[in-house]
């Protein structure tokens, strides 16, 4: 997966074989200079396997990705990794949503949209990053393959 907002960041999933854990390698995040295509740095994501679906918040300060045990958040330099959602997802998107705080004030919230790849693959969950809670569920007629906003 790749994020390119102000810099090119590449998420490498490593090797993950659920039947042979001795061959597994941890995932990593690399920063590539977009002008000369040289590696600026690479950081191993400790105890993270099969990382995929890298997305960024609008300010490029926080990154989110899926891995074998759920959805994770990290700083844009690969530090401070924490698990946000503890079920396996293979779809991940972010969105900023507005809402009325009162008659004259509009608030904004960063949302993650994920699926449950194993338990309910026809369901999309909306997760509010500010409150760390699920705030909506969308059920569709078939397995979720992708999420797009228009």
What does each model-found stretch correspond to?
Residues 7-11, 61-65, 106-114:
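Conserved beta-propeller blade signature
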Residues 13-16, 66-69, 115-119:
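Short loop/turn segments immediately following the C-termini of beta-strands
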Residues 27-30, 70-72, 123-125:
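A short loop-to-beta-strand structural motif that recurs across blades of beta-propeller domains
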Residues 38-46, 80-92, 133-139:
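A short beta-strand motif characteristic of beta-propeller blades
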């Amino acid at each position: 997966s790749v994020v390119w907002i102000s810099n090119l960041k590449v998420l490498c999933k490593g090797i993950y074989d659920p039947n042979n854990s001795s061959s597994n390698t941890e995932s990593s995040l690399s920063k590539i200079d977009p002008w000369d295509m040289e590696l600026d740095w690479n950081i191993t994501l400790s105890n993270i396997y099969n990382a995929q679906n890298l997305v960024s918040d609008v300010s490029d300060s926080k990154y989110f990705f899926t891995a074998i045990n759920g959805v994770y958040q990290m700083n844009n330099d690969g530090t401070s990794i924490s698990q946000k959602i503890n079920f396996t997802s293979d779809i991940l998107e972010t969105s900023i949503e507005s809402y009325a705080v009162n008659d004259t004030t509009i608030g904004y919230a960063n949302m993650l949209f994920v699926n449950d790849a194993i338990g309910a693959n026809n369901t999309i969950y909306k997760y509010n990053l500010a409150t760390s809670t699920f705030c909506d569920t969308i059920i569709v007629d078939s397995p979720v393959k992708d999420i797009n906003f228009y």
